[in-house]
């Protein structure tokens, strides 16, 4: 659902920032 999508987006952003 929307919340799962949001979690995925946030996880991707955090992953990118953690390079």
Curated annotation (Swiss-Prot):
Coiled coil: none annotated. Keywords: Amphibian defense peptide, Antibiotic, Antimicrobial, Secreted. It is found in: Secreted. The keyword Cell inner membrane does not apply. It comes from the Eukaryota. Expressed by the skin dorsal glands. Its main location: secreted. GO terms for biological process: defense response to bacterium. One of its GO terms (cellular component) is extracellular region. Shows a weak antibacterial activity against B.cereus, E.coli, L.mesenteriodes, L.innocua, M.luteus, P.haemolytica, S.aureus and S.uberis. This is Uperin-2.4.
């Amino acid at each position: 659902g929307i919340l799962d999508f949001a979690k995925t987006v946030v996880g991707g952003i955090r992953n990118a920032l953690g390079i």
